[in-house]
Design a protein with these regions (language model features):
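S-adenosylmethionine
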Residues: 1-442
């Protein structure tokens, strides 16, 4: 979307409106299609895609914005007449006028299934999620109907912009001086209430970046686990596009400068299983399969060595690293707030193939870490097939691995689950739905 806005030379209010129309329509698409179906003699899937997309934009303006109804209908009909044709514009006009007779709150009881008879279907239509995703999130969050509704509603909120100040290169104080606000959890985070993040000098100079708080905390948790002996060789096995690698690289070089947890010297055992702050002096190897993503990692990091390699079949010797990060490819169901189109593009049939890849990457990471070293397995998805099932399967197969309680290395955050894994949630923490498992090689 940002690239398209630049191409069309839209900025300021026009860019904001275009972004809201596009992302807002994508978030509400499932609900809007049910309403369109109720106002038409044709099912949405039978309507030509360009015409249907224009009507969806009009419905979003009618039901979720302050655009006057006559303006929403008129501009949409004009767009259809210009891009599709006169006949299609008459159809769009008829549908939108019917939609405009009720508010969203009035439409929902009409188009959504009865919650007593079909709670999953009711939530899917009311909160505009595919049914399979609602089922998967229900299984993962383990909450009641009200909590599920809160989670799905949070997926439809615009995410706040969170910045990360990379230690040794920037500071939270610098970000605050640039107009950001204090963050809740990560000691390196600040919230940007408005404006373009690229206009922040530290971001423009790659000393800071946009990074969700949960993503930052996953990195911090890995660096806080006490490791006996040497602690100078770190690996990011799936480093592209570089968000976690950028923070890992900075902490590896400069250490955890926040002072929120006890500091240990590099290679010194803290004598405790609790979180301790790394003091610096490590080297990061950032591995990425795709060349263009490896280039992004190279641009993001300062001191890391970046290699293009298949993480499931690495060239290095087993046991070469003290700490390993596995930010595994996943469905991204934890980031639906910032990628509203993903809920409609993802297919549950991809889960078996993804699961095999995730298991292969975690196995490779555990082979790559030395005995006594630690592996962080993270996904931006709470789907149990990508999280607990993957880690549990590996733990059953291998007797040289133990799961640590990831929550104990994140003392800033409550509500991360029953352990030993940590699960962030949009409705509880205001972050992406990031999952973390910490595993020590025996």
């Amino acid at each position: 979307m940002p690239a398209l806005l630049r191409e069309r030379r839209l900025s300021g209010r026009d860019a904001g409106l275009a972004t809201e129309l596009a992302y807002g329509t994508l978030r509400g698409l499932g609900t809007y299609d049910e309403i369109i179906a109720a106002c038409s003699d044709r099912a949405p899937e039978k309507v030509d895609p360009p015409l249907l997309d224009a009507i969806r934009l009009g419905v979003h303006q009618l039901l979720k914005t302050r655009v006057p109804p006559h303006a929403a209908v008129g501009t949409t009909v004009d767009l259809v007449r210009l891009r599709v044709g006169i006949g299609a514009s008459k159809y769009a006009n008829a549908v939108l006028r019917k939609v405009s007779t009720r508010s969203l709150e009035q439409w929902l009881p009409i188009v959504a299934p009865d919650p007593a008879e079909d709670p999953i279907g009711h939530l899917a239509v009311t909160h505009s999620h595919p049914r399979w995703i609602v089922t998967a999130l229900r299984d993962a969050v383990g909450g009641d109907f009200d909590e599920m509704a809160a989670l799905l509603a949070a997926d439809n909120e615009r995410p706040r912009v969170t910045l990360v100040a990379r230690p040794g290169r920037s500071s939270v104080e610098e970000l605050l001086a640039s107009g950001a606000e204090p963050a809740q959890y990560s000691p390196y985070a600040a919230y940007l209430p408005e404006g373009d993040p690229g206009a922040v000098l530290a971001v423009a100079e790659s000393r800071a970046a946009v990074q969700d708080e949960a993503s930052q905390l996953v990195v911090l948790a890995l660096t806080r686990v006490p490791v006996e002996g040497a602690d100078s060789r770190w690996l990011d096995l799936c480093a592209g596009p570089g968000g976690k690698a950028g923070l890992l690289d900075a902490i590896a070089t400069h250490g955890d400068e926040t002072g929120r947890v006890p500091v240990r010297a590099s290679g010194e055992h803290a004598g405790s299983s609790g979180p301790v702050a790394f003091s610096g002096g490590a080297n990061l190897l950032a591995a990425e399969l795709q060349y263009h993503r490896a280039r992004l990692v190279w641009q993001t990091t300062r001191n890391a060595s970046v290699v293009t390699v298949d993480g499931t079949a690495p060239a290095w010797r087993p046991g070469s690293f003290d700490r390993v990060m596995v930010d595994a490819p996943c469905t991204g169901l934890g980031a639906l707030r910032r990628r509203p189109e993903a809920r409609w593009r993802r297919d549950p049939r991809s889960l078996p193939e993804l699961g095999r890849l995730q298991r292969d990457l975690l196995t490779s990471a555990l082979d790559s870490v030395r005995p006594g070293g630690v592996v962080a397995y993270a996904t931006c998805s709470p789907h149990l097939a990508e999280t607990a099932a993957v880690v549990g399967d590996i733990l059953r197969r291998r007797d040289d691995v133990e799961a640590l309680d990831a929550r104990s290395y994140l003392p800033e955050v409550d509500g991360l689950g029953e352990g030993p894994y940590a699960q962030f949630w949009p409705h509880r923490h205001g972050t992406d739905g990031m999952f973390l498992a910490l595993l020590r090689r025996r």
